[in-house]
Amino acid sequence: MNNGHSGSSGQASVTAIVGLAASIVALLVSVVTAGYNLVGYFQKPELTLLPPEQVTLHINYSGKFAYLAMVTDFNIFNDSRPEKYGLVTGERLEFTIDGVRRVLRWQEFGKWGDKGFQASGPAQPFGVAGGTVNAQEVSFEPRSKDQSELLPGETEDINWFDWDKFLQFMGKASTLRVHCVVELHGGKTLTSDVELQLHEGVKAALQDPKRRWAAAACKKL
């Protein structure tokens, strides 16, 4: 015989099971969340340097001495969680001509305007937040090489490449390989290699005494 008590007992059992299932789900969610947070805590920023599309070659002066300088865009992507910052401590361009390696280091950040590159501030360390891209136009200039780093036959001003010698090189070359480097806090680096396309239009612009600058397209290597 059926009475009201059996129905109530069945409903109570169902309610208890549902409550237990909800508790288990909540526990699993909290465990997964805790695990995610724990993994995130130990995760290091994952940064990538995207290769530039072009590099501008231009003349610059130290007193009366004319030398080669460059401007390009460095785009640094941080593929990490938002709270994971990467600290950029330096940027440089490296190139080798006639067997001599030269280095240009970041000088200023800026933007392109009607009159060309307009500096907006000195280059200094900056952070890149997770999930973002830091995109900046950067001018690169030579620096004196430390005496402790000099190779046989080198001088402290080895990184200043004479403009006329560059034009001589360019007259017989069709490309120039450039090694792009981002220096990170902790000693790690990001790199990207490109090959500048020195076609006739670029050469003509660089040789024009009224201009002396040109944007060379980059081929990713």
What is the predicted role of each segment?
Residues M1-L221:
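Membrane-aqueous junction of the first/signal-anchor transmembrane helix
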